[in-house]
Amino acid sequence: MLTWTLWCGLLFLLWIYFLWSRRRFYLLTLKIPGPLGYPILGMAHWLMRREDILNAFGCFLDKHGPTIFSWLGPIPFMIVSDPQVVQDIFTSPHCVNKGIIYKAVDDGAGVGLFSLKDPRWSIHRKLLNPAFGHKVLLSFLPIFNRETALLLDQLEPLQDDGEKDLIPLLQSFTLGIATQTTMGSDVKDEESFRSNSLLGRYQCILETMTDMCFSPWLNSRFCRQLAGKESHYYQAKTEIRQFIRKIIERKLAEDEMGALPSIQSNDKNLFLNLVTDLMRRGVFTLKNVEDESNIIVFGAFETTANAVYYTLMLLAMFPEYQERAFEEIKTIFPNTGDFDVSYADTQQMVYLDLILNESMRVIPPVPVVSRQTSQDLKLSNGIVVPKGVQIAIDIYHMHRSKKIWGPDAETFNPDHFLPHNIQDKHPYAYIPFTKGIRNCIGWRYALISAKVTLAKLLRNYRFKTSFPFENLYFVEDITMKLKSVPLLELQKRT
C-alpha cells in the first residue's frame, strides 16, 4: 500500500513538473485566441483528413482572427495569416528552422537546403547562392527555350481533341529542365530519363513524403512496411540516388582526367559544378552533393509545373484575361510556332507579370509553410512566443483575405497587381516564395522559366475548360493540390 502511494505521489510530482515546465505555453493562450480542442488531442482531430485541413484553418482564422494558438496533441501550435506577424517570423533569426512536419523530407529527398537547421543552413545557403545568380539564370535560357519547343511538339496532337489532363506532360517537361539546369544537358541520354521512369520515381517519393508529413507514424520504416508503402518508396529512392551518383561520378572522373566535359558549353554554370568543387575543397561530402542536387530538382520541377498549369487553368476560366495576355505576347512575337524568348523579351511582358502574380496569389505554390521557434520570439505587438512553438504560416488564406485584398479577394483578377492597387499592401501580404531570411533560393529561376513557357504556350494555343472556378477545391499538401484537376482544351492560334 505504501509503495502504491509513493508511486502515485511520484507520478503526481512529475505531472506537476511537466505542467510547470510548459507554463509559458499555457499563458500564451491568454494572449492569443484559438480553439481549445480536447485533452491530449488538442485540435488534431480537426486535421485528421488532409482534404479538410485548409478549410479547418479558414474556419479557425474566421472565428479567432488572423493569429491563433492551440495544440496539436502535446505540441504548442500557431496558425498565422497576419502579414505583420508573418514578417516578424520570417525576419527573425530565432525562427529560421523549418517545422517538425518536414522531417519526412530528410528521409525522402535528403538533408539539404530545404530542411537543414541553422547554423548549418546559413552556411549551405551562402555557399550555394552563386548557383542562382542573375547571370547564371540567364545562361539557362537556351535550355528553357529548347525544352519548351519540345513541349509544343508534344502538345500539337492534342489540339482540337477535347479536354485533356496536361499535368503529366508539364511535370515531365519541368523535370527535364530541372535535371538539366542542375546536372547537365546530357542527363537526357540516361535510360531512366528516356523511359520516363525517373518522373515516376520522383512522384512516388513525393507522394510518400506527403503521407509521412501528415501521418507522422509513417516516418517509421516498420509502419510504412505495415501500410504497404515501403517497397516502392525504397526502390524509388534507390534508383534516384543511383541516377544522381552516376552523374556526379562521371563529372568527378572527367575533372580528374582533365578531359573535355561531356556537358555542353552553356552548361558551365551548372549547380553540379559548384557543389562538386565544394567537395574537392573538402567543404562538402559526397552525401552533401547528392542531397543538395536532389533537393534542387525536387524543389523545382513540381512547383513550376503546377504554377504553369494553374495559370493556364485560370486563364481558361477567365478568357478575357487570356486574350489580353495573348495580345501583349503577339506584339512581341508576331508569328506562331517556335521562337526564342530572351530575358529582354520577358521584361516586356508586363501584363503576363500581373497574371502570374495573381495566379500565385489565388493558388500559391505552397499553401502553408512551417517554422519553429529556436529561441523566444518577440512579435511587433509585444507578445513573446516561447521557444519550442510550431508555427504554420497560412499563405493560402492570407492571399485570399478580404481585409487585405478587397471584396473580390477570392476571385482571379490580375488588376490586383496594378501599381495603384499593390502599392499600399503590406510587403509580406504576398509571399508565393516566402520571404525574409529563409526565402526560396530558386524564386527567380521559377519566374523566368514560367514566363518563357507561358509566352510560348499562350502565343500558340487558346486554352479552354468547362470546369467552373467556383468548384475548385484545394487540398493541403507539401505543394498546392486540387481535389479534382480541371481538364484543358487546346485550340491552335494563328
Curated annotation (Swiss-Prot):
InterPro entries: Cyt_P450 (IPR001128), Cyt_P450_E_grp-I (IPR002401), Cyt_P450_sf (IPR036396), Cytochrome_P450_Monoox (IPR050196). GO terms for molecular function: heme binding; iron ion binding; monooxygenase activity; oxidoreductase activity, acting on paired donors, with incorporation or reduction of molecular oxygen. The keyword Oxidoreductase applies. Coiled coil: none annotated. Heme binds at residue 440. It is found in: Endoplasmic reticulum membrane; Microsome membrane. Its cofactor is heme. It comes from the Eukaryota. Its main location: endoplasmic reticulum. CDD domains: CYP313-like. One of its GO terms (cellular component) is endoplasmic reticulum membrane. Signal peptide: none annotated. It is a peripheral membrane protein. Its EC number is 1.14.-.-. The keyword Oxidoreductase applies. May be involved in the metabolism of insect hormones and in the breakdown of synthetic insecticides. Belongs to the cytochrome P450 family. This is Probable cytochrome P450 313a4.
